[in-house]
């Protein structure tokens, strides 16, 4: 179903069964598959391919040669009807690739809202990208990676399968991330190691001086005290009890499956 207010360029191919919302714009030479839903006001600039069971929300801008919802690169994939879901107000730049999930990995690749995916960024099968994240040019997420809200992944950076990038993290360019990065941390290098707290990013997002001080103290306990994770957990829990901004930092320890960067 194509809304009567949507624009479809004469050279675009929109297959029967696709749903195109009000005021959406499908530009020249785009291809939209039969199981695709595109929300109100979303713009496909030109030469964009959207395939598979893919749902895209409203007011997104998707630039030329982006490929969304195509078959993933997992050799176990056998054609199952897995999905891609994309939220609202994302900017997906040239040649970005977002692959559908796998049956073994939950069947869903998900991108939230208000993200910027720069040129050539790759989001592999079963990844989850939160809200207000930035993947810079050529940033690559392997399968099953989670990127939490407000995280920034620098250009040419690769993230290993199943890694978790915490909220408000900044990973510097040309890095290789092979373990989980706790919230608020700056990481850099191959393999990525911690370089402090993302103070400037947190200031821009309105964190108070007291919260920043508490987060720094938690960071120092984890990375500068010389103690094991089990030893510092109770101390960080005490800080989190007084400063709720530290709670996500503490909770991340239980989420981690690949171990924390060191």
Curated annotation (Swiss-Prot):
Compartment(s): Cytoplasm
Keywords noted in UniProt: Acyltransferase, Cytoplasm, Lipid A biosynthesis, Lipid biosynthesis, Lipid metabolism, Repeat, Transferase
Protein purpose: Involved in the biosynthesis of lipid A, a phosphorylated glycolipid that anchors the lipopolysaccharide to the outer membrane of the cell.
Gene that produces this protein: lpxA
Catalyzed reactions per annotation: a (3R)-hydroxyacyl-[ACP] + UDP-N-acetyl-alpha-D-glucosamine = a UDP-3-O-[(3R)-3-hydroxyacyl]-N-acetyl-alpha-D-glucosamine + holo-[ACP]
Protein name: Acyl-[acyl-carrier-protein]--UDP-N-acetylglucosamine O-acyltransferase
This enzyme's EC code(s): 2.3.1.129
Domain of life (superkingdom): Bacteria
Molecular function via GO: acyl-[acyl-carrier-protein]-UDP-N-acetylglucosamine O-acyltransferase activity
Assigned protein family: Belongs to the transferase hexapeptide repeat family. LpxA subfamily.
One GO location term (cellular component): membrane
Lineage: Bacteria, Pseudomonadati, Pseudomonadota, Gammaproteobacteria, Enterobacterales
Keyword set includes Chaperone: no
Pathway membership: Glycolipid biosynthesis; lipid IV(A) biosynthesis; lipid IV(A) from (3R)-3-hydroxytetradecanoyl-[acyl-carrier-protein] and UDP-N-acetyl-alpha-D-glucosamine: step 1/6
Gene3D superfamilies for the chain: Hexapeptide repeat proteins (2.160.10.10), Udp N-acetylglucosamine O-acyltransferase, C-terminal domain (1.20.1180.10)
GO biological process terms held by the UniProt record: lipid A biosynthetic process
Binding partners and assembly: Homotrimer.
Pfam families hit by this protein: Acetyltransf_11 (PF13720), Hexapep (PF00132)
């Amino acid at each position: 179903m194509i809304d009567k207010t949507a624009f479809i360029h004469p050279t675009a191919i929109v297959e029967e069964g696709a749903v195109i919302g009000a005021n959406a714009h499908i530009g020249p030479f785009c291809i939209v598959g039969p199981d695709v839903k595109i929300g109100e006001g979303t713009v496909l600039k030109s030469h964009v391919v959207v395939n598979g069971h893919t749902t895209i929300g409203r007011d997104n801008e998707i630039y030329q040669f982006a490929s969304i919802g195509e078959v993933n690169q997992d050799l176990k994939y056998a054609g199952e009807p897995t999905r891609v879901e994309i939220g609202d107000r994302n900017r997906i730049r040239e040649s970005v690739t977002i692959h559908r999930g796998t049956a073994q990995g939950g069947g869903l690749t998900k991108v939230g809202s208000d993200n910027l995916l720069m040129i050539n960024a790759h989001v592999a099968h079963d990844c989850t990208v939160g809200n207000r994240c930035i993947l810079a040019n050529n940033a690559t997420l392997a399968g099953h990676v989670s990127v939490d809200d407000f995280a920034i992944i620098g250009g040419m950076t690769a993230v290993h399968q199943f890694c978790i990038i915490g909220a408000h993290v900044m990973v510097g360019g040309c890095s290789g991330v092979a373990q989980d990065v706790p919230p608020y941390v700056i990481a850099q290098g191959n393999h990525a190691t911690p370089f402090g707290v993302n103070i400037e990013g947190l200031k821009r997002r309105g964190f108070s001086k007291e919260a920043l001080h508490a987060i720094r103290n938690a960071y120092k306990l984890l990375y500068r005290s010389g103690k094991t994770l089990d030893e510092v957990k109770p101390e960080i829990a005490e800080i989190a009890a007084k400063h709720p901004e530290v709670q996500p930092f503490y909770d991340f320890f239980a989420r981690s499956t690949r171990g924390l960067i060191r």
